[in-house]
Curated annotation (Swiss-Prot):
Name by which UniProt lists this protein: Cystic fibrosis transmembrane conductance regulator
Residues where Phosphothreonine is found: T717
UniProt-listed Pfam families: ABC_membrane, ABC_tran, CFTR_R
Membrane topology: Multi-pass membrane protein
Subcellular location(s) per record: Apical cell membrane; Early endosome membrane; Cell membrane; Recycling endosome membrane
Species classification: Eukaryota, Metazoa, Chordata, Craniata, Vertebrata
Covalent link Glycyl lysine isopeptide (Lys-Gly) (interchain with G-Cter in ubiquitin), residues: K688
Functional note: Epithelial ion channel that plays an important role in the regulation of epithelial ion and water transport and fluid homeostasis. Mediates the transport of chloride ions across the cell membrane. Possesses an intrinsic ATPase activity and utilizes ATP to gate its channel; the passive flow of anions through the channel is gated by cycles of ATP binding and hydrolysis by the ATP-binding domains. The ion channel is also permeable to HCO(3)(-); selectivity depends on the extracellular chloride concentration.
Annotated organism of origin: Microcebus murinus
An example molecular function term from Gene Ontology annotations: chloride channel inhibitor activity
Gene name as annotated: CFTR
Length: 1481
């Protein structure tokens, strides 16, 4: 960043904002980079501002029982705030004085008052000076208030972030991500722009009193008629506002429904394509869009009338003020023109400034109170440590996640009177839930000496992670004592990777030790992985480590924990994502050798780990089931296997037992007490929750097996559009903005630079922060991501674009002592953005405008209609000129008033009186037409938005995966949310305002030019100057806005990253470091925002300077030109003053239109995406059967020409090569093999070898070369949908969209209920579905969060059965499954797919033994393809993975079936008394 010219700028340069000229010049000539942005002043740095506010807040906390945040803010910012308020008031006073001088100038043209005529020139000078004074007061005041608002936002941003790092885990579990994002965006954004309006709460009333005093002098009591009309108008607009809010509230829910489905579609686009659901998803989304647009039109019409009422009220205000006075006394032109000028100022004060100011105060005080409540939440308390102790002791410890744990689950109760769901009845789903007082850990005791290894085991949800949390101090014990030294290192169960390099993630701010670092890298098996990267360990990782496999992330997290020199190491299931070979090696080299002298607590379920542990603690339902050595365990607890693995023999489970497990799953429900829904209303059966940080928690989601524990949570994040999940009392009139999203689906909120409007999209169910922290990367069904490319393949991510990472990137110095630097260099700055650097011009091209106008044919005719109505209004204005020109002739002979003023009377009892009313009648008719003229325009522009949304949705669904892989899920979602909302809401009315303002200016210039042609000569250069200024400013401002929007991403990325790794941060004591990084991100955003505010003020001031010069010229031309009557002078000066404000408004509106049209450009960019190669141009709706006609079928013994295809499932792969991107590196090369019909083939290979990629290539989801034939039919000879229909797919990432069970199983509605129930029976889903009200019509939301992962896998299995596919692709179907569901899947595969070809990618040896042949993939190629017997007899990866005991036990069983052409699946393995070993490959 460059040093700011502001530091050395003179007073005049600061006053006129001339110091911004270098950046404006540079932005006009070339594209701006972050290196071009100026450094922020030290007074604006987050460090200084946060320290200042934190000091005052601490003072407030210490001195009062009821501390008020507003008092702390007042002590920090009050005097500057008031100073700029006084400047603003003085500037506004000049507006009230200007009409007085205008009236005196008009009066000076009285033919009988020659003295007054001689001072007209001085009055003109005075009037021009008032404009100059106003300009010099108003712009510094507005900028100063914007600046203070920015500083307040920064200070509170920092204060909130620091508080977040201190919050207790109990509090975090009650706060949703949406609430935090809302707190840091919607609420704080109110200060940026709102502060400039806040002073009008007292300025506007004073101004009204001053203006009414002046109008009383002119019109006496009749002046209050105009004021009364304005008050009625303000109340009318308030009513329209409430009506608009009602429509927006209704519409927000519809928008949310559409965006939920859209985001699920985007995030799971690969599954959509694999299932051939493109048409079904398109139809589903379009139906929701239709409902949404009905409400959108209603809201737009109300907003249109609200806006039009202001524009057309000016005539009636003047008319109602003047008419009573004229009827009684008659009126002269001077009073009319003076009244017009007064009423313009009065109208703005009453209908705009005062209501806006009141709303600003209401919103700001509400935001301050929310922040104040948040800042007083309970904080995390560290335990008291004994630094001298060398042992870890826990004595009789009991703990609750909150007092009286056992969440008060909301049970369903159907009220027979009002059909509402209410809380309190525990009879519908649950029985015997005596949950109050249920502890998460009960009476736990153990003691381990220094250097010992304690293995903690237990079933899912037994309390293992809670035990580690209690040692770390995250969970406070209610009874008992804990003793240890306090020097802790921690490795989370779910890998946490911060954006940055591998080295940064491992060192994590600890001083660098080369030998220790290399030892840790080696022990954690990271050497080979690091060697593959060109930058080695300095490669920049994306948010959440998206560029890495799950195993690599797990090893880096482990390496971070091991690198820190601590007394106690807490390792929470660190081997969950590792293949069995890597796991064995790391356990031996790292845990057993490298850490041999350290105290270790390892959470594990592996038998070999228990054998090598010094002590074993087995937990069961929160209690200590066993504590001792392994030999004692075998002797004392021979039944420990079932407690360890979490299940007994599957065959011992009755249907009732399995249903009771489902009942545990149903505890995931929470019902909103006031939701007026009926169980029978299918669209309203989604269980909603409020986002309240309130008295009752409504988001408790517990695991589905045997437990009420806290940390077995697999919960899905709801869509929080605009990143917002507001409190129930939050106004729904919100800025429309999207938050970057994280890997877990949180949002990032872009903020408009002026005043944003738009709906809030509320999530249906809130995601607590605690659940985010305990959320598995692989288990999470993400809705949209913040800073990472979407992984749209089954498991392996394509190489990410490393130019889009966060500010953490490359922060290690290259010196030998590698402390993490706290400086941000320009390389870092380039990598901090969310959105791709858009290839969109700084200024919207004319081609975009032309294409937008021609989207809908009638739009051109609507524009012509508006122009015709405008020309009619101009004609009426010319009639007025004629009346004014002839008024003296009428009045000379018939006036009843004094001769001194008879020359100027236009309303008398003579014929002129009637002529005037004829004019009024014509004017009213045209005003009525003008009032409605924009309605067709708004209606048509919304229709254009509808068409563009449809085209973009179709384009995205038909785009190839190589194109979609190059984009981010969050970026695509922004097009459907933020950009479509702009097309729906902002663009139509902004275009209407601009056209209307432009026509008003043209009309006023035309009238003035007719009266005084010389003025037209002065008008031309002014308009040309405005156009040049606009073009000059627009190039820079749009780039600065883009940089500011992008610079906001690191703030929210850092917030979500910190939340996900909060336990790790605390364990490592890195809160200060992360606070520093957060301040750096804030400063980066501030630099862009401050520069944008400064350049905007430069532009506004230059526009006003040009106008002041124009007004001076007009004034002196009018005054110095002889022979002018007071009527013409009054019209010229009044219109000139009106032109000033209107032309400025029009120029600003044109800039807004250009800015909003960038959304149209982005939408067109998506519409123009390529479609999948070979995609049929006609619509292909999947049918039950696929008959091949006119398709070349290769000779194949397994298929007949007339058969339904595919009939056998024989598959031949020839020279298959696959790439993620066009021209990219080959991920698979020259793969060739053949599969017989009905054969089962297992895919083997280490993590990242390409197994899942091969399955994607079969479905043509990648760029592929070579050929695949199924039953003799080549993939080149049929459409993509026909090809993909041949496959049934159970992906690693399960896709459950928001909709009914029926829709999820059969989105095309091809099958009857009987057929669906039959399949549900086959896969074991019937008992699950029947538990829900509505059964097949029950609405699943949030990725089916009420279902366990196993139930979701069964849904995928049911889809495959319904598809009648002959080839089944399974990508790690047993990952994260409970044992029961796993056995159901195995049984279903045996029964429902007995005659199908199965290709299985799996880590569990037990599952792989069902296969007849194995395909071993290494280094992108097929290394081996043979039977299990052959692989076991040779040196192979399979032989390395399987133990000798398993080989001896399992080989004969497999060998006995080798003579059969297609052996049946081995009978389900009964649970024995032998050791249970979860062996995975």
């Amino acid at each position: 960043m460059q040093r700011s010219p502001l530091e050395k700028a003179s007073v005049l340069s600061k006053l006129f904002f001339s110091w911004t000229r270098p950046i404006l010049r540079k932005g006009y000539r070339q594209r701006l980079e972050l290196s071009d942005i100026y450094q922020i002043p030290s007074a604006d740095s987050a460090d200084n501002l946060s320290e200042k506010l934190e000091r005052e807040w601490d003072r407030e906390l210490a001195s009062k029982k009821n501390p008020k945040l507003i008092n702390a803010l007042r002590r920090c910012f009050f005097w500057r705030f008031m100073f700029y308020g006084i400047l603003l008031y003085l500037g506004e006073v000049t507006k009230a004085v200007q009409p007085l001088l205008l009236g005196r100038i008009i009066a000076s043209y009285d033919p009988d008052n020659k003295v007054e005529r001689s001072i007209a020139i001085y009055l003109g000078i005075g009037l021009c000076l008032l404009f100059i004074v106003r300009m010099l007061l108003l712009h510094p005041a507005i900028f100063g208030l914007h600046h203070i608002g920015m500083q307040m936002r920064i200070a509170m941003f920092s204060l909130i972030y620091k508080k977040i790092l201190k919050l207790s885990s109990r509090v975090l579990d009650k706060i949703s991500i949406g609430q935090l994002v809302s707190l840091l965006s919607n609420n704080l954004n109110k200060f940026d722009e709102g502060l400039a309006l806040a002073h009008f709460v007292w300025i506007a009333p004073l101004q009204v009193m001053l203006l009414m005093g002046l109008l009383w002098e002119l019109l006496q009591a009749s002046a209050f008629c105009g004021l009364g009309f304005l008050i009625v108008l303000a109340l009318f607009q308030s009513g329209l506002g409430r009506m608009m809010m009602k429509y927006r509230d209704q519409r927000a829910g519809k928008i949310n429904e559409r965006l939920v489905i859209t985001s699920e579609m985007i995030e799971n686009i690969q599954s959509v394509k694999a299932y051939c659901w493109e048409e079904a998803m398109e139809k589903m989304i379009e139906n929701l869009r239709q409902t949404e647009l009905k409400l959108t039109r209603k809201a737009a019409y109300v907003r249109y009338f609200n806006s039009s009422a202001f524009f057309f009220s000016g005539f009636f205000v003047v008319f109602l003020s003047v008419l009573p006075y004229a009827l009684i006394k008659g009126i002269i032109l001077r009073k009319i023109f003076t009244t017009i000028s007064f009423c313009i100022v009065l109208r703005m004060a009453v209908t705009r400034q005062f209501p806006w100011a009141v709303q600003t105060w209401y919103d700001s005080l509400g935001a301050i109170n929310k922040i104040q409540d948040f800042l007083q939440k309970q904080e995390y308390k560290t335990l008291e440590y004994n630094l001298t102790t060398t042992e870890v002791v826990m004595e009789n410890v009991t703990a609750f996640w909150e007092e009286g744990f056992g969440e008060l689950f909301e049970k369903a109760k159907q009220n027979s009177d009002n059909r509402k769901i209410s809380n309190g009845d525990n009879s519908l789903f649950f029985s015997n839930l005596a949950l109050l007082g249920t502890p998460v850990l009960k009476d736990i005791s153990f003691k381990i000496e220094r250097g010992q290894l304690l293995a903690v085991a237990g079933s899912t949800g037994a309390g293992k992670t809670s035990l580690l949390m209690m040692i770390m101090g995250e969970l406070e014990p209610s009874e008992g004592k804990i003793k240890h030294s306090g020097r802790i290192s921690f490795c989370s169960q779910f890998s946490w990777i911060m954006p940055g390099t591998i080295k940064e993630n491992i060192i994590f701010g600890v001083s660098y030790d080369e030998y220790r670092y290399r030892s840790v890298i080696k022990a954690c098996q990271l050497e080979e992985d690091i060697a593959k990267f060109a930058e080695k360990d300095n490669i920049v990782l994306g948010e959440g480590g998206i560029t890495l496999s799950g195993g690599q992330r797990a090893r880096i997290s482990l390496a971070r924990a091991v690198y820190k020199d601590a007394d106690l190491y807490l390792l929470d299931s660190p081997f969950g994502y590792l293949d069995v070979l890597t796991e064995k090696e790391i356990f031996e080299s790292c845990v057993c050798k490298l850490m041999a002298n350290k105290t270790r607590i390892l959470v594990t379920s592996k038998m070999e780990h228990l054998k090598k542990a010094d002590k074993i603690l087995i937990l069961h339902e929160g209690s200590s089931y066993f504590y001792g050595t392994f030999s004692e365990l075998q002797n004392l607890r021979p039944d420990f296997s079932s407690k360890l693995m979490g299940y007994d023999s599957f065959d011992q489970f009755s249907a009732e037992r399995r249903n009771s497990i489902l009942t545990e799953t149903l505890r995931r429900f929470s019902l909103e007490g006031d939701a007026a829904v009926s169980w029978n209303e299918t669209k309203k059966q989604s269980f909603k929750q409020t986002g309240e940080i309130g008295e009752k928690r409504k988001n408790s989601i517990l695991n589905s097996i045997n437990s009420l524990r806290k940390f077995s949570v697999v919960q899905k994040t709801p869509l929080q559009m605009s990143g917002i999940e507001e409190d129930p009392d939050e106004p729904s009139e919100r800025r429309l903005s999207l938050v970057p999203d994280s890997e877990q689906g949180e949002a990032i909120l872009p903020r408009s630079n002026v005043i944003n409007t738009g709906p809030t999209f509320q999530g249906r169910r809130r995601q607590s922060v605690l659940n985010l922290m305990t959320h598995s990367v692989n288990q999470g069904q993400n809705i949209h991501r913040i800073n990472a490319a979407s992984t749209r393949k089954m498991s392996i991510a394509p190489p990410a674009n490393l130019t889009e990472m966060d500010i953490y990137s490359r922060r290690l110095s290259q010196e030998s002592s590698l402390e993490i630097s706290e400086e941000i260099n320009e390389e870092d700055l380039k990598e901090c953005f969310f959105d791709d650097a858009e290839n969109i011009p700084a200024v919207t091209t004319w081609n975009t405008y032309l294409r937008y106008i021609t989207v809908h044919k009638s739009l051109i005719f609507v524009l012509i209609w508006c122009l015709v109505i405008f020309l009619a209004e101009v004609a009426v204005s010319l009639v007025l000129l004629w009346l004014l020109g002839n008024a003296p002739a009428y009045n000379k002979g018939n006036s009843t008033i004094s001769a001194n003023s008879s020359y100027a009377v236009i309303i008398t009892s003579t014929s002129a009186y009637y002529v005037f009313y004829i004019y009024v009648g014509v004017a009213d008719t045209l005003l009525a037409l003008g009032f409605f003229r924009g309605l067709p325009l708004v209606h048509t522009l919304i229709t254009v938005s509808k068409i563009l949304h449809h085209k973009m949705l179709h384009s995205v669904l038909q785009a190839p995966m190589s194109t979609l892989n190059a984009l981010k899920a969050g970026g695509i979602l922004n097009r459907f949310s933020k950009d479509i909302a702009i097309l729906d809401d902002l663009l139509p009315l902004t275009i209407f305002d601009f056209i209307q303002l432009l026509l008003i200016v043209i009309g006023a210039v035309a009238v003035v030019s007719v009266l005084q042609p010389y003025i037209f000569l002065a008008t031309v250069p002014v308009i040309v100057t405005f156009i040049i200024l606009r073009a000059y400013f627009l190039h820079t401002s749009q780039q600065l806005k883009q940089l500011e929007s992008e610079g906001r991403s690191p703030i929210f990325t850092h917030l979500v990253t910190s939340l996900k790794g909060l336990w790790t941060l605390r364990a490592f004591g890195r809160q200060p470091y992360f606070e520093t990084l957060f301040h750096k991100a804030l400063n980066l955003h501030t630099a862009n925002w401050f520069l944008y505010l400064s350049t905007l003020r430069w532009f506004q001031m230059r526009i006003e300077m040009v106008f002041v010069i124009f007004f001076i010229v007009v004034t002196f031309i009018s005054i110095l030109t002889t022979g002018e009557g007071e009527g013409q002078v009054g019209i010229i000066l009044t219109l000139a003053m009106n032109i000033m404000g209107t032309l400025q408004w029009a120029v600003n509106s044109s800039i807004d239109v250009d800015s909003l049209m960038r959304s149209v450009s982005r939408v067109f960019k998506f519409i123009d995406m390529p479609t999948e190669e070979g995609k049929s141009t006609r619509s292909i709706k999947p049918s039950k059967d696929c008959h091949l006609s006119k398709v070349m079928v290769f000779e194949n013994p397994h298929v007949k020409k007339d058969d339904i295809w595919p009939s056998g499932g024989q598959m031949t792969v020839k020279d298959l090569t696959a790439r993620y991107l066009d021209g990219g590196n080959a991920i698979l090369e020259n793969i060739s093999f053949s599969i017989s019909p009905g054969q089962r083939v297992g895919l083997l290979g280490r993590t990242g070898s390409g197994k899942s990629t091969l399955l994607s290539a079969f479905l043509r989801l990648l760029n592929t070369e070579g050929e695949i034939q199924i039953d003799g039919v080549s993939w080149d000879s049929i459409t993509l949908q026909q090809w993909r229909k041949a496959f049934g797919v159970i992906p690693q990432k399960v896709f459950i969209f928001s909709g009914t069970f029926r829709k999820n199983l059969d989105p095309y509605e091809q099958w009857s209920d009987q057929e669906i129930w039959k399949v549900a029976d086959e896969v074991g889903l019937r008992s699950v579905i029947e538990q829900f009200p509505g059964k097949l019509d029950f609405v699943l939301v949030d990725g089916g969060y009420v279902l366990s992962h196993g139930h979701k896998q069964l849904m995928c299995l049911a889809r495959s059965v319904l598809s009648k596919a002959k080839i089944l692709l399974l990508d790690e179907p047993s990952a994260h499954l409970d044992p029961i569901t796993y056995q159901i899947i195995r049984r279903t595969l045996k029964q429902a797919f007995a005659d199908c070809t199965v290709i299985l990618c799996e880590h569990r040896i037990e599952a792989m033994l069902e296969c007849q042949r194995f395909l071993v993939i290494e280094e992108n190629n097929v290394r081996q393809y043979d039977s299990i017997q052959k692989l076991l007899s040779e040196k192979s990866l399979f032989r390395q993975a399987i133990s000798p005991s398993d080989r001896m036990k399992l080989f004969p069983r497999r060998n006995s079936s080798k003579h059969k052409s297609r052996p049946p699946i081995t009978a389900l393995k009964e649970e024995t008394e032998e050791e249970v070993q979860d062996t995975r490959l």
